[in-house]
Amino acid sequence: MATKIRLKRLGKIRTPHYRVVVMDSRAKRDGRAIEEIGQYHPKADPSVIVIDSERVQYWLGVGAQPTEAVVALLKRTGDWQKFTGDTSPSGVKPQPERPNKDDLFNAALAEADEAPREAITKKSEGAAADEASESAAGDNSGEKAEA
């Protein structure tokens, strides 16, 4: 049986998620897989690539043919270099750990408590202050016209 290592598309419209799978070469793109050996999330920043290196080496050794897209992923993880014996480094950056949401929330609360608060005026006081400033401005313009 001719096997291929290729991507199986999952996810909604415009939010693709892929699984790296080993399939019969004649099967549908999203059909039944022999084995799932990884996943790829291109929309995450940085993109998430998780591949079981041991299983990839096994399937490549048995003769499974990777597609061009999978070869590109394998080069980024360094698995293709292991298989071919190439010594060039892989281009994967480790994904930074996400901060805990509770810690972020508590930090924002602490920052809000430390910030100086401005005086809050009621609507009626604000309207009275506006009227007083308008009448004062009107009185000054009348004096200039007389002079």
UniProtKB/Swiss-Prot annotation:
Gene Ontology annotations of biological process type: translation
HAMAP family the UniProt entry points to: Ribosomal_bS16 (MF_00385)
Positions of region (Disordered): 81-147
Superkingdom field: Bacteria
Keyword check for Ribonucleoprotein: yes
Family: Belongs to the bacterial ribosomal protein bS16 family.
Protein name: Small ribosomal subunit protein bS16
Keywords: Ribonucleoprotein, Ribosomal protein
Alphabetized InterPro entries for the sequence: Ribosomal_bS16, Ribosomal_bS16_CS, Ribosomal_bS16_dom_sf
GO cellular component: cytoplasm; small ribosomal subunit
Pfam family, one: Ribosomal_S16
Positions with biased composition (Basic and acidic residues): 95-104, 114-125
Organism listed in the record: Cutibacterium acnes (strain DSM 16379 / KPA171202)
GO molecular function, one term: structural constituent of ribosome
Low complexity bias: start-end ranges: 126-140
The keyword 4Fe-4S is assigned to this record: no
